[in-house]
C-alpha cells in the first residue's frame, strides 16, 4: 500500500563509505548504497510485507563496502512472510549464489521485462508467439503451476 523511501544513503568519498541523511544531499560524491538506517527500516518492512518486488541491486554490490544494502534486502526478501518476486540478471545471480532461490516466490532474469509483465504491457517475444499461433491456427494453453 505504500512506497517506502530511503532516509539515508552511502556515498563513495575517496573510496570510503560515508553514510549521509537525505537532507544532506546533494554532495559531490557518487551514491553507492543505501544508508544503514534505511537498510534497517526497509528490511523490517520487507519482512512484514504481503508482496515484495525487488528489481535490481540496492547498491554497487561489486564493492564490499557498498554491498550491504543489496545483501540485506535479499536476506529480508528470503525471510518475508509474503510473496517475494525478484527481477533482473544481477539480482537473480546474487539470489542463486547466496542459496536463496527456494525462499523466493519467483526469480526472473529479465528485470525490465518482469516489470513490463507486472504492469500488463505487451512483451514482444510473447506477442510474436501469439501472432504465430494465430497464423498457424494453434491453440495456446496456459500452464498453471501449483504451489
Label each PLM-derived region with a short phrase.
Residues 1-147:
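Active-site loop-to-helix "anion-binding N-cap" substructures in soluble metabolic enzymes
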Amino acid at each position: 500500500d505504500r512506497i517506502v523511501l530511503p532516509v539515508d544513503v552511502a556515498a563513495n568519498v575517496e573510496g570510503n563509505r560515508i553514510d549521509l541523511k537525505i537532507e544532506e544531499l546533494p554532495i559531490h560524491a557518487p551514491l553507492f548504497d543505501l544508508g544503514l538506517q534505511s537498510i534497517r527500516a526497509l528490511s523490517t518492512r520487507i519482512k512484514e510485507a504481503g508482496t515484495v518486488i525487488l528489481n535490481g541491486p540496492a547498491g554497487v554490490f561489486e564493492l564490499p563496502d557498498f554491498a550491504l544494502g543489496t545483501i540485506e534486502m535479499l536476506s529480508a526478501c528470503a525471510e518475508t512472510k509474503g510473496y517475494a518476486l525478484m527481477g533482473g540478471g544481477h539480482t537473480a545471480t546474487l539470489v542463486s549464489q547466496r542459496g536463496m532461490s527456494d525462499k523466493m516466490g519467483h526469480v526472473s532474469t529479465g528485470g525490465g521485462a518482469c516489470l513490463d509483465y507486472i504492469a500488463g504491457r505487451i512483451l514482444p517475444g510473447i506477442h510474436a508467439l501469439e501472432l504465430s499461433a494465430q497464423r498457424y491456427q494453434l491453440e495456446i494453453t496456459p500452464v498453471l503451476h501449483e504451489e
